């Protein structure tokens, strides 16, 4: 039986339509949420990511600013820029694109961002808000995973949920979100024992470990006795360039193998592609979780604008123009 495909692109379009309505309603009150992105250096992947985020802002009607400090920037210089953005009433969200150059203390820079403008949801204050189940800004990828589950009618309360990965960016916040939704949550990592058996008990599996095809198809709970198979959320986006590895992972997908031969690479998730024949529902790679990350960044920017104004935290006063804006 082929799994039901959990299409992240479709859900992105639904949420974008909802956000456009929210943004239009805010505009009637003279409010236009805005996102400031900070990109250091010439990393092609980072440039592409930021370009996509700015394009999403333009599509939705959000204000956006791109700040491009030079590669040789210091930690202190970055902290001054963040302080300027924290004080700017027009800026509702601040995005620091990672990685930063080696000479910059990324932890200090990220933690200098006002929690009220931390639209990535990485600040310790926002993590604490999530732990205590209070309104705040949640890390974008886990928030997107929850939207996929909820909008596809996946039952969360009482479900056995397994999260593979314990990173601060995905694994830990994902586990907390599932816990707050009344799932019974198990978090696994590199030291976990009997991993296949743990995964086989999962009604919901979230894989976020960064290893192509690590979760085997026969680890996934199949449909049985009228109950659906596991819902699988595959966060991994791994570029496979080795022909033998591609052949092993894509042996049952001749069209994808043909594309690999033409391009020299293929994107594969953390779950073996053959799981499409075992799982009850499955996010594709690409086209599953990926589109949701930028979507939730946009959602967080709108949410930050509303939360800050409701709390009277519209800013600390207008500052001098932020550095390197363009």
Segment roles from a protein language model:
Residues 2, 9, 15-21, 25, ...:
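Adenosine-phosphate binding glycine-rich loop
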Residues 77-89:
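Short, well-structured alpha-helical segments in soluble
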Residues 40-55, 135-253, 263-273:
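Glycine-rich phosphate/diphosphate-binding loop of Rossmann-like nucleotide-binding domains
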Residues 95-157, 198:
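Anion-binding alpha/beta catalytic cores of soluble intermediary-metabolism enzymes, centered on
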Residues 1-11, 104-108:
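Helix-enriched interaction subdomains in cytosolic or periplasmic regions
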Residues 28-32, 155-156:
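Short, flexible coil/linker segments at domain boundaries that flank nucleotide/cofactor-interacting
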Residues 35, 57-72, 185-187:
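Short beta-strand elements in bilobed, periplasmic/extracellular small-molecule ligand-binding domains
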Residues 96-103, 211-213, 237-240, 288-289:
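Short glycine-rich anion-binding loops that position phosphate/pyrophosphate groups of nucleotides
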């Amino acid at each position: 039986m082929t799994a039901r495909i959990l299409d992240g692109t479709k859900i992105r379009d639904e949420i974008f339509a909802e956000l456009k309505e929210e943004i239009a309603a805010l505009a009637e009150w003279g409010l236009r949420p805005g996102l400031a992105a900070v990109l250091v250096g010439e990393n092609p992947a980072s440039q592409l990511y930021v370009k996509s985020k700015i394009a999403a802002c333009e599509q939705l009607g959000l204000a956006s600013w791109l700040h491009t400090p030079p590669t040789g920037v210091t930690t202190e210089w970055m902290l001054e820029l963040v302080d300027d953005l924290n004080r700017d009433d027009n800026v509702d969200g601040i995005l620091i694109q990672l990685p930063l150059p080696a000479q910059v203390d990324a932890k200090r820079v990220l933690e200098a961002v006002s929690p009220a403008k931390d639209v990535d949801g990485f600040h310790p204050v926002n993590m604490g808000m999530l732990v205590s189940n209070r309104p705040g800004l949640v890390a974008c990828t886990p928030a997107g995973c929850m939207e996929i589950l909820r909008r596809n009618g996946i039952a969360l309360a009482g479900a056995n949920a397994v999260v593979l990965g314990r990173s601060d960016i995905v694994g830990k916040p994902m586990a907390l979100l599932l816990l707050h939704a009344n799932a019974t949550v198990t978090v696994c990592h590199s030291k976990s024992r009997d991993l296949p058996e743990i995964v086989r008990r999962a009604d919901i599996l979230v894989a976020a470990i960064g290893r192509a095809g690590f979760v085997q198809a026969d680890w996934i709970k199949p449909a049985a006795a009228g109950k659906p198979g596991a819902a699988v959320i595959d966060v991994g986006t791994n570029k496979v360039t080795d022909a033998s590895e591609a052949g092993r992972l894509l042996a049952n997908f001749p069209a994808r193998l043909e594309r690999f031969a033409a391009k020299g690479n293929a994107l594969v998730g953390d779950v073996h592609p053959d799981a499409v024949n075992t799982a009850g529902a499955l996010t594709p790679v690409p086209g599953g979780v990926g589109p949701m990350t930028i979507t939730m960044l946009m959602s967080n920017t709108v949410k930050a604008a509303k939360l800050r104004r409701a709390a009277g935290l519209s800013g600390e006063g207008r500052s001098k123009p932020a550095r390197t804006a363009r």
